A protein has these predicted regions:
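Positively charged n-region of N-terminal signal peptides that target proteins for export
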Residues: 1-5
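Cell-envelope and extracellular/periplasmic
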Residues: 19-144
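Bacterial N-terminal signal peptides
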Residues: 6-15
């Protein structure tokens, strides 16, 4: 139920700031890897390879601060937030909750998809660490 409310709230949140064009929505669902546990400081390693420098430039400003992507919106279930949901324009910090801003696949996925479609996109992300695919992600039709 919480996921459904999150999705509806996200769509309402974004719909007021968009034109009448259809919105590209991507669902990101998974376990701990989808949560995203990478520290922001790991992004500097992208500068070590000429092939990944363009990606780093899409993620960070020239001064090393995180870019905020105006055409990429995200709504993410976040237990560290009082409301249980963190939403806004995509930037560093939508990874797993904790003391420091973290990143997950939402960052590069969102940047790549927005660049590919050339339109505003919405990411709806939900992930839980420590879950079993065998039990926690089984559809009700799979039986006991």
């Amino acid at each position: 139920m919480k996921v459904i409310l999150t999705i509806l709230a996200s769509l309402l949140f974004v719909s007021f700031s968009l034109s009448a064009k259809p919105l590209k929505v991507y669902l990101l669902v998974g376990q701990s890897n989808m949560q995203g546990h990478a520290a922001e400081r790991t992004l500097g390693h992208l500068a070590m390879d000429a092939k990944t420098v363009p990606l780093l430039k899409a993620i960070q400003n020239a001064d090393g601060s995180a870019k905020v992507h105006d055409q990429i919106w995200i709504s993410s279930i976040e237990v560290a937030e009082e409301s249980g949901v963190k939403e806004g324009k995509l930037t560093v910090g939508y990874g797993a909750g904790g003391r420091d801003p973290k990143i997950g696949p939402e960052l590069t996925f969102g940047i790549t998809m927005q660049k590919h479609v050339g339109e505003t996109v919405l990411l709806i992300k939900t992930a839980w660490g420590g879950k079993s695919l065998n039990t926690d992600f089984r559809p009700p039709s799979a039986g006991p």
